Swiss-Prot record:
GO terms for biological process: argininosuccinate metabolic process; L-arginine biosynthetic process; urea cycle. One of its GO terms (molecular function) is ATP binding. This is Argininosuccinate synthase. L-aspartate binds at residues 124, 128-129. Its main location: cytoplasm. L-citrulline binds at residues 92, 97, 128, 132, 182, 191, 267, 279. Belongs to the argininosuccinate synthase family. Type 1 subfamily. It comes from Sulfurovum sp. (strain NBC37-1). The gene is argG. One of its GO terms (cellular component) is cytoplasm. Keywords: Amino-acid biosynthesis, Arginine biosynthesis, ATP-binding, Cytoplasm, Ligase, Nucleotide-binding.
Amino acid sequence: MAKRKISKAVLAYSGGLDTSIILKWLQDEYECEVVTFTADLGQGEEVEPARQKALDMGIKPENIFILDLREEFVRDFVFPMFRANAIYEGEYLLGTSIARPLISKKQIEIAHQTGADAVSHGATGKGNDQVRFELGYLALDPDIAVIAPWREWDLNSRTKLLAYAQEHGINIDNKGKPKPYSMDANLLHISYEGEHLENPYAEPEEDMWLWSVSPENAPDEPEYITISYKNGDPIAINREEMSPATILETLNTYGKKHGIGRIDIVENRMVGMKARGCYETPGGTIMLKAHRAIESITLDREEAHMKDELMPKYAKLIYNGMWWSPERKMLQAAIDATQENVEGTVKLKLYKGNVIVVGRKSEVSLYSEEHSTFEADDVYNQKDAEGFIRLNALRFIIEGKKQPERIKSLIGDYEETEVCRIETGSITICERIKRFFGFGKKTDKNA
């Protein structure tokens, strides 16, 4: 199929080997003008060098965009996701997945601003990111052209990439010393894939982990912190109010120090294969624990249970790149409605990889000490439980009377076996069972 004629393309550009080669390839293959977009999501690397690299490759200064998106990333993407307590397949806190919608959004905005008719990314044809990026592009601009070089070119090995870079005079720092892993980082996490991790039985080397100390080498003394919440979002640490990005940066500092947030998982990619990934999400791990703790005293029981039922669906939508979908927006509206009274303070103990909740309080707490006390109280009539239990057991009682053979299959024949002769008061256990289901005469009203 003939290539669509492209006049200008916005490239998600990091300044690294892959995207620098893509930049040159777009110029040669599509003969189009290229606009570079570099996002600062708190990945911990200098982003300004990408400007000079783009200039060196002939990009006009007005076509180079480097944006600090840290606050927007945490406020508008990370925090809403954490209101849902989203976890994919029980462990993954979606650090890569949640960054892609924002990058897609900014690329489309820049395309409209510069009059570009295409966008391009550096995701491979085997991973999830190609789907996440492109679903975002097409949700926000159905007419935009999408260029995915990894699905078009034949540069399918690092050797070929380096040869292409050398042939075209692309200056890549340390191009002869590739990183040992495929990595992605932002304020929420850092990920590692590839190399010896492709053997799912091989233990990661300790020097792979770049953010956190190992739990074994973490401080021998625990550290206590408090996190304050308002409308489901953290607003202060140790009573000091901070911006969203600063909140996450601060929690990352605590988590890294105490070896918190490391996971090693094999996940089911949306493209059909299983892939192993190692992740460090120190601040996010602390934040998730604290959020669930404050919800435990401020959410109604059924509200909390329904949220837990919705969470896997929500997490799957994020993982699969469906951030801009109607169903994600619908779920987000429902989740956000539950957060109106999720406010208060959580006290945490951080110790050798563990986040331990040791206290929680709220002015709108649904926890009532006078109702839940084990001591004498004047507000809870324990006799009220009898009717509640009888009503909940009504279907069991009817079933026991109408279908006695089924009950017998569950507890055996009603003979005074060795077990049944165990006495509780003046009657045996079997007699109690028979009376409960209406098979025996009840002579003791307290039985």
